[in-house]
Amino acid sequence: MELNVTTLEGKAAGSVNLSDTIFGLEPRTDIIQRVVNWQLAKRQAGTHKTKGRAEIARTGKKMYKQKGTGGARHGSARVPQFRGGGRAFGPVVRSHAYDLPKKVRALGLRHALSAKAKDGSLVVLDNAELKDAKTKALIGHFSGLGLTSALIVDGAEVNNGFAQAARNIPHIDVLPIQGINVYDILRRQKLVLTKAAVDALEARFK
């Protein structure tokens, strides 16, 4: 598929041929969902914790004698049925991460890219470079391009001035090509790739 290339100023800068094996797939939401769930599970803190009966600071002595009271039989006061007792099967500190095959992760990325291309939400920039790190100037460029919510992906190195200028703009994310991922692609309305990013993606999935 062929897509027009624009500059930051909104001027035409030729066109680029995009590989159908990366940008022309019929998006499969089930694969995309698997990758997003994997990403979110991996970044979950997992610091939740409640005390079990073994961790409660309370005596382990038998509460009262076994027989002759007319009451139910009880041993420890740390058990869950008593006020102040430990939680039964409570959450513990753990990692929520799980494995997802590399091929599924790669396929999920290609389907996310194809989904943006199919929706008309893919923009290709000639380059993402700013001489002066001025947020006001960059906001003007973005409004001219109609970008209010976008993920901008550059080549192996992001231009320092561009990254600094974009840092304070809400709903705008800037990543190098190594950081491109399914979740960040989907959470913004537009996906903006530089020509360097397109070349890197095509080399990666060759």
From Swiss-Prot:
Keywords, ordered alphabetically: Ribonucleoprotein, Ribosomal protein, RNA-binding, rRNA-binding
Annotated Pfam families: Ribosomal_L4 (PF00573)
GO biological process: translation
SUPFAM superfamilies, per the entry: Ribosomal protein L4
This protein's record includes keyword DNA-binding: no
A GO MF term: rRNA binding
Role, per record: One of the primary rRNA binding proteins, this protein initially binds near the 5'-end of the 23S rRNA. It is important during the early stages of 50S assembly. It makes multiple contacts with different domains of the 23S rRNA in the assembled 50S subunit and ribosome. Forms part of the polypeptide exit tunnel.
Family the UniProt entry places it in: Belongs to the universal ribosomal protein uL4 family.
Protein name as it appears in the record: Large ribosomal subunit protein uL4
Organism, scientific name: Afipia carboxidovorans (strain ATCC 49405 / DSM 1227 / KCTC 32145 / OM5)
